[in-house]
């Protein structure tokens, strides 16, 4: 499926949802699928995108196509749902692909890599560049067809029990971080910890970790991270625009009628837009509340940023020499990133920089 078919099918699904083609809807067999998310219900924006998707599918199909949504741990562990979807134990994994970095670092390119594309650029690469095509070719090896289902936008850099004044303060630091971020920070002395979202608070509270990153103000406040670590750092340079995905078992998806396939595509697109809109609306107020309750905002020191960038580029080059999946997709990704960076430098970056300097 290319981007034109997605647009065409989304239009078809809209017609079905509006009731303009009732014969098509009523002719479909009733279907019941299960979706397992990597996120807890408490995170109503992350987990909520699965609910938005499932509700849209139900509405567009006139109630004939129902998808039950399950939070992390209910029917599958947070990081076990990809395997479950691959094997057909469930139809859909709702997740962030970089959680499966250990299987193949290439998974991260379908989600986010440090110093990678921002949310708009990622959506552009997926829908108007080669991103969707390349990632689907890769996921096919895992019996998966992916659909973007939300983006968090740029994230914060996490909560720390002590200040990070220079790169020296990273040595021996036990830091909860997902995906590729841990790999680029490891050479700088960080000890990465992979912990599901619902377990971050107790780990930080007990001192099992010295710091932890999650998403941004709204979700971090939901988890109460400000109560167990005072220093809130920015930017989250390892997650400049993190995409979530629906990873659908290919046999299950291919068994659908064209009308139901169109509905799935349209519902995923709706959920994709919904997630970032909610984050952009909710994060400003949440940040004010966090600062008002005592959170101490800090910017990462320049040496941390510079050395992290060097570490990332070195690792990307090494992977291009050892991993054929990575080499093929990253070549396209990095070219797209360079072109986007050039354009954004003259448009968004200059505009945003000016506006940030104004008193509004």
Place the predicted regions along the sequence by residue.
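N-terminal secretory/targeting leader peptides
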Residues: 2-19, 24-122, 130-360
């Amino acid at each position: 499926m290319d981007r034109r078919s997605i647009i065409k099918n989304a239009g078809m699904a809209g017609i079905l949802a509006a009731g303009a083609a009732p014969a098509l809807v009523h002719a479909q067999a009733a279907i019941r699928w299960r979706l397992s998310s990597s996120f807890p219900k408490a995170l109503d924006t992350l987990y909520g995108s699965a609910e938005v998707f499932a509700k849209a599918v139900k509405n567009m199909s006139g109630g004939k196509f129902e998808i039950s949504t399950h939070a992390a741990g209910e029917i599958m562990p947070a990081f076990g749902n990809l395997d479950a979807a691959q094997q057909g134990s469930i139809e859909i994994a709702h997740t962030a692909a970089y959680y499966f970095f250990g299987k193949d670092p290439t998974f991260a390119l379908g989600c986010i890599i440090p110093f990678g594309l921002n949310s708009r650029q990622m959506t552009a690469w997926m829908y108007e560049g080669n991103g969707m095509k390349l990632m689907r070719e890769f996921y096919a090896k895992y019996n998966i067809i992916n659909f973007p289902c939300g983006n968090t936008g740029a994230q914060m850099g996490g909560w720390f029990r002590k200040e990070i004044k220079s790169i020296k303060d990273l040595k021996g630091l036990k830091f909860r971080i997902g995906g590729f971020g841990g790999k680029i920070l490891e050479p700088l002395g960080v000890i990465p910890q992979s912990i599901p979202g619902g377990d971050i608070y107790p780990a930080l509270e007990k001192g099992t970790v010295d710091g932890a990153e999650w998403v941004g103000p709204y979700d971090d406040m939901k988890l109460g991270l400000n109560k167990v670590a005072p220093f809130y750092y920015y930017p989250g340079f390892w997650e400049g625009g993190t995409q979530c995905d629906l990873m659908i078992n290919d046999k299950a998806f291919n068994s659908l009628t064209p009308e139901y396939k169109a509905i799935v595509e349209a519902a995923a697109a709706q959920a994709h837009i919904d997630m970032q809109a909610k984050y952009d609306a909710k994060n400003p107020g949440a940040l004010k509340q966090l600062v008002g309750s005592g959170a101490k905002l800090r910017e990462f020191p320049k040496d941390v940023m510079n050395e992290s960038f060097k570490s990332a580029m070195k690792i990307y080059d090494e992977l291009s020499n050892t991993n054929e999946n990575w080499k093929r997709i990253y070549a396209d990704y990095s070219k797209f990133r360079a072109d986007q960076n050039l354009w954004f430098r003259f448009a968004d970056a200059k505009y945003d920089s000016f506006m940030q300097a104004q008193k509004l």
